[in-house]
């Protein structure tokens, strides 16, 4: 355990001579108490850096979400479909075939009235 703590301190400080000095049992005990304090301080420092990194990633996600919202608001295809529907409604209202049939029916009624009037005279 003492060697592991000494190696952790050596790795964080970048000093290989500290690991070799920790092999002696007399210096390992005081070094262990100081290493736990330094390791705890360094882990707190790294945790703060991790929080900063996560904040940057959330900002990037927010920018990507904004881009997606712009794409959703640009869609104009439903408006085009509505215009096409309006054109179909105009075609349906233009039909005058029933009016022509009514005029033809009126002509038939007139011809029917003439023969009825002729025998009565």
UniProtKB/Swiss-Prot annotation:
<feature type="signal peptide">
    <location>
        <begin position="1"/>
        <end position="21"/>
    </location>
</feature>
<keyword id="KW-0574">Periplasm</keyword>
<feature type="region of interest" description="Disordered">
    <location>
        <begin position="40"/>
        <end position="121"/>
    </location>
</feature>
<dbReference type="Pfam" id="PF06392">
    <property type="entry name" value="Asr"/>
</dbReference>
<dbReference type="InterPro" id="IPR023497">
    <property type="entry name" value="Acid_shock"/>
</dbReference>
<feature type="compositionally biased region" description="Basic residues">
    <location>
        <begin position="84"/>
        <end position="93"/>
    </location>
</feature>
<keyword id="KW-0732">Signal</keyword>
<feature type="propeptide">
    <location>
        <begin position="22"/>
        <end position="63"/>
    </location>
</feature>
<comment type="function">
    <text>Required for growth and/or survival at acidic conditions.</text>
</comment>
<feature type="compositionally biased region" description="Low complexity">
    <location>
        <begin position="94"/>
        <end position="103"/>
    </location>
</feature>
<feature type="compositionally biased region" description="Basic residues">
    <location>
        <begin position="104"/>
        <end position="113"/>
    </location>
</feature>
<protein>
    <recommendedName>
        <fullName>Acid shock protein 2</fullName>
    </recommendedName>
</protein>
<dbReference type="GO" id="GO:0042597">
    <property type="term" value="C:periplasmic space"/>
</dbReference>
<comment type="similarity">
    <text>Belongs to the Asr family.</text>
</comment>
């Amino acid at each position: 355990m003492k060697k592991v703590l000494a190696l952790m301190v050596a790795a964080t400080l970048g000093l290989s001579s500290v690991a070799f000095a920790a092999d002696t049992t007399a210096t390992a005990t005081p070094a262990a108490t100081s290493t736990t304090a330094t390791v705890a301080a360094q882990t707190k420092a790294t945790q703060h850096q991790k929080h900063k990194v996560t904040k940057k990633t959330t900002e990037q996600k927010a920018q990507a979400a904004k881009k997606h919202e712009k794409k959703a608001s640009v869609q104009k295809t439903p408006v085009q479909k509505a215009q096409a529907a309006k054109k179909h409604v105009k075609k349906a209202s233009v039909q005058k075939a029933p009016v022509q049939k009514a005029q033809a029916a009126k002509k038939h009624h007139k011809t029917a009235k003439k023969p009825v009037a002729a025998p009565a005279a």
